[in-house]
């Protein structure tokens, strides 16, 4: 048997923490007097880095912008991070773990933080829908594969 078959996959959460938080209401208090029919924009981004052997930090950045016409009602950004021990996987499996599995763990924490910040800004409750990071990761892989195909066709 090869050594690879003897290595079991291991995953452990070491820590989950808020790395950065920002809340701005640039048009307050005037925005409170307007009819509340906002356009809400959600942006997501993930980043990961290796801290030590089998230890990784994953950061999920969630930015929510609510606008009333041309005016920004509020802008909220949360960077929710986690430190994870991950061993026994490599390549695409590791990329999936860092790019989808860990963000799935972090998102509820980021969502709660954003909901709290929006509430403290005295805006109506904001309920962010769950995010399918697995589907986003698959789309990312398909885009990367498409770009690789285009590069080979241009050559």
UniProtKB/Swiss-Prot annotation:
UniProt keyword Lipid metabolism present: no
Entry GO terms, CC: cytoplasm
Intracellular or extracellular location(s): Cytoplasm
One Pfam family from the record: SecB
Task of the protein: One of the proteins required for the normal export of preproteins out of the cell cytoplasm. It is a molecular chaperone that binds to a subset of precursor proteins, maintaining them in a translocation-competent state. It also specifically binds to its receptor SecA.
Subunit structure: Homotetramer, a dimer of dimers. One homotetramer interacts with 1 SecA dimer.
HAMAP family xref list: SecB (MF_00821)
Similarity comment text for this entry: Belongs to the SecB family.
Protein name: Protein-export protein SecB
Organism lineage: Bacteria, Pseudomonadati, Pseudomonadota, Gammaproteobacteria, Enterobacterales
